[in-house]
A protein has these predicted regions:
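Extreme N-terminal starter segment of soluble prokaryotic enzymes
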Residues: 1-3
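Conserved glycine-rich cofactor-binding loop
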Residues: 9
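N-terminal Rossmann-fold NAD(P) dinucleotide-binding loop
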Residues: 13-14
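Glycine-rich phosphate-binding loop and adjoining beta1-alpha1-beta2 segment
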Residues: 25-58
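A structured beta-alpha segment of the ubiquitous adenosine-cofactor-binding alpha/beta core
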Residues: 54-78, 85, 104-111, 124-135
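Rossmann-fold NAD(P)-binding glycine/threonine-rich loop
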Residues: 89-158
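Acidic, His- and aromatic-enriched active-site or binding-groove loops in soluble protein domains
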Residues: 161-178
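Long, compositionally biased stretches enriched for glycine and/or charged residues
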Residues: 183-452
């Protein structure tokens, strides 16, 4: 079986490949292909991938590294999509430009997320068309390109029959943190319920061996005033710089996890996705953001630098620090999902899917994030009761903003894109929305379609 990773130059690629290789018997994979339009970057990452496959794990999996679409997708069974259109240079614009107007500057939320979405819609549609043309007829695309909410809505609208499952690892990262906070060794034994949109949802239940963990979690968060356990805080240097309130010192993620405490002080019933901070505490997040040093800069100075410094060191000395080659835990998540699809396991995963009545008081065609059982025919979504009015109201505002953005992008409609920016909860007024949009149009020349 062939698995292709589209966006092979990503810092996450080595970790994903390792997860695939560790499941090589389950997946029956004999070839992994890396595909990217940035040859220089991908060639460097491929050095690490080759080491993982043929030295660390000593597999006989064939590695193909290409910039050619036909070579990348021919006879592929799975395509993992992790594109970042515009790279970190454009991510930096997405984050810093809204901050100049007093609005949240974030990769996937608010105006920055909408800018990123506008750049990604048509490249994702091209990827689907290329895969349809060259891959096996029963292919699956597993897409975790951000912003997943906007991308999944565009796929639903423009390529409704595509065999694509849109996923996000942030809820899984939250469960990782919950497991650490609760002292649970095997996070796979945690069972949870969740509803929302992508980067816009809530855990309604978290159980371990039948025990409801929510009361313990609420108490833990209230006592510590943050969800992160001490080991995580030490890892980001937060415990050594407690007097500073600058994001550059502690890292922007510290405030996102601290925001879990602040949200639950007011709305304690559900555990929120960390991204809800940008909507429910937009003013506060702008106030302690550094407009000259955002998350894009942090990533370039840490994950990016560590990976490519590690590659250079390996090429010069032959010495390997494997810790520099792995970033995040979503490789396991994606590989497990692939195994469920291939082997019809009916394992439970959280996915982004068309609602189709699963949440009765949300639109039928809304792209929602819900648990589903995954088998060879795709997801079987787990339906639930009506959601509370507060969450429904927030979700409808966000959903309609995303739908208008996709419509505006596809139609080339300036008015609809402006409506999307205006409707977004991170933007205080129509005039601010217009000022940001006009600046975004200038910054995204060559990436966005023309708007009239």
């Amino acid at each position: 079986m062939v698995i292709t990773i589209a966006g092979g130059g990503s810092t996450f690629t080595a970790g994903i490949v390792k997860s695939i290789a560790l499941r090589r018997e389950e997946l029956e994979v004999d070839e992994i292909r890396l595909f990217d339009i940035n040859k220089e970057r991908q060639d460097k990452v491929a050095v690490v991938v080759d080491w993982v496959l043929h030295k660390e794990l000593n597999t006989d999996i064939k590695l193909v590294v290409t910039t050619d679409v036909q070579q990348a997708y021919t006879d592929a069974s799975f395509v993992f999509a992790q594109m970042r259109v515009g790279g970190y240079a454009m991510r930096e614009q997405d984050e810093k430009l809204p901050l100049r107007h007093g609005c949240v500057g974030q990769e996937t939320c608010g105006c920055g997320g909408m800018a990123y979405g506008m750049r990604t819609i048509f490249p994702m549609i091209k990827l689907i068309d290329d895969v349809e043309k060259y891959a096996k007829k029963d292919y699956w695309i597993l897409n975790y390109s951000n912003p997943a909410a906007i991308v999944s809505e565009a796929c639903r609208k423009l390529r409704p029959k595509a065999r694509i499952i849109n996923i996000c690892d942030m809820p899984i990262a939250i469960i990782d943190v919950v497991a650490a906070a609760m002292g649970i060794q095997n996070k796979k034994e945690i069972v949870y319920d969740y509803f929302g949109l992508n980067h816009f949802g809530w855990f309604t239940s978290i159980q371990y061996h039948g025990e409801d963990l929510m009361p313990k979690l609420r108490a833990y968060i209230k006592e510590n005033k943050i969800l992160l356990p001490e080991s995580y805080l030490k890892g980001m240097g937060a415990l050594t710089s407690s007097s500073s309130q600058n994001r550059h010192t502690k890292g922007s993620w510290y405030y996102v996890w601290k925001g879990e405490y602040e949200i639950m002080e007011n709305f304690p019933e559900y555990l929120p996705n960390t991204y809800l901070n940008y909507y429910l505490q937009a003013k506060e997040f702008v106030e302690h953001s550094d407009p000259n040093h955002t998350r894009a800069n942090e990533v370039e100075e840490t994950r990016e630098k560590n990976l490519f410094d590690g590659i250079d060191h390996y090429l010069k000395t032959g010495e390997v620090d494997a810790n520099t080659f792995y970033a995040g835990s979503h490789g396991d998540w994606i590989a497990d999902l692939s195994a469920a699809l291939k082997n019809d396991t009916k394992a439970r995963f959280l996915i982004i899917t068309e609602n189709r009545g699963a949440i009765p008081n949300m639109p039928y065609d809304a792209m929602v994030e819900l648990p589903a059982y995954i088998g060879k025919n795709g997801p079987e979504v787990i339906a639930r009761d009506n959601i509370p009015l507060f969450q429904q109201g927030l979700m409808m505002q966000q959903l309609n903003s995303e739908k208008l953005l996709v419509e505006g992008c596809v139609e080339g409609s300036y008015e609809k894109v402006l409506q999307a920016f205006t409707l977004n909860k991170t933007v205080p007024s129509m005039n601010v929305a217009k000022a940001i949009l006009d600046d975004m149009i200038e910054a995204n020349k060559g990436y966005w379609p023309e708007l009239h």
